A protein has these predicted regions:
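Short, well-ordered alpha-helix to beta-strand connector turns
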Residues: 9, 46-47, 78, 112
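Short beta-strand-centered segment that lines the nucleotide-binding/catalytic pocket of NTP-utilizing
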Residues: 14-23
Length: 134
């Protein structure tokens, strides 16, 4: 992910990285403050939005609505990269509410290029090598 972001910057592609859970929390606060439309507009305009750790925890009603807004605003206009350790088949349950889950997943899954990575995580490998020399 870091190498990809570095390459995008070399190509002058504007990106924004966010942990999905943290982004939802920030946008809930901006909704309470009345600034969510401006924040969503900034997300909509970025060339590549990276949502990391997608579907790691169930979404509440407000987060579902915000996620739907983000995906709908960006759908077929701008690129969105989603990383997750949760299998795609389980995203439906994590998103919850059938109508929104259908709409979000239809836009994400059916118009995407999927790259599945297998094997040990880099963090785990780095930790082992640091402990071996530590």
């Amino acid at each position: 992910l870091h190498s990809l972001r570095r390459r995008q910057r070399q190509m002058c592609i504007r990106d924004r990285y966010a942990s999905t859970a943290k982004l939802m929390s920030q946008l809930k606060i901006s909704k309470a403050k009345g600034t969510i439309l401006a924040d969503l507009k900034r997300i909509e305009r970025v060339d590549l939005m990276i949502l990391d750790d997608f579907c790691m925890q169930p979404l509440d009603a407000q987060s579902r609505g915000i996620l739907m807004d983000i995906i709908e605003d960006r759908h077929q206009r701008r690129s969105t990269m989603i990383t997750s350790q949760i299998p795609v088949k389980d995203w439906y349950d994590v998103i919850g509410e059938k109508t929104i889950a259908d709409a979000v997943l239809d836009r994400i899954v059916h118009h995407s290029l999927r790259v599945e990575l297998f094997g040990e995580s880099i963090r785990k490998r780095k930790s082992k090598s640091e402990n071996a020399y530590g």
